[in-house]
Amino acid sequence: LRNAGTALGFALGQARALLGSGRPALIFVQLAHEANETGLIYGPGLAQFGIDPDAVTLVRAETVSDLLWAVEEAVVCTAVAGVVADVATPHKALDFTISRRLALRAEAAGTSAILVRYGLEREASAARYRWRVMPAASRPPPFDTRAPGLPRFLVTLEKGRLAGLAEGTSITIDWTKDNGFAVADPGRSADEDAAR
């Protein structure tokens, strides 16, 4: 769980891109006992990712079965842009069959389900994409080089093909408040990358 914040930040950045006037809601689902250990999402933090905290519904499920039921029901709601399910520990119920069912339901409804998992072991999944996400050192902001910069992620596409990225490709991406993710250019600041 060491990089839990990084994985969740990457998932929230993806979820932000899904939100729109026709689908203004985001559902965040977490096991209650895991939330006690890993923490909850934070309104001002959501705002930093361009997500209105009022657009997010937080679901704390008691069991994995309840969590999966909540995800499955939420993806078919016409107001929901996406569902982020944060699952910290391995569970037998999260197998290929359930991931396939969730993927098919989300695709049929025109929405997305983002399942955030932690750990180094791969698990069978019908997900279209699987990313391995690690933190990367951020660039300091230009006004104070000692201050932390905006989030930066080292991501590896483990499954799927996306915008010319082949499986196994790793890239560093910056988070920009206005434009979301941008591929990092080592010679520029995150704001300069976003302005290009």
PLM regions with names:
Residues 1-196:
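N-terminal regions of ATP-driven nucleic-acid and macromolecular assemblies
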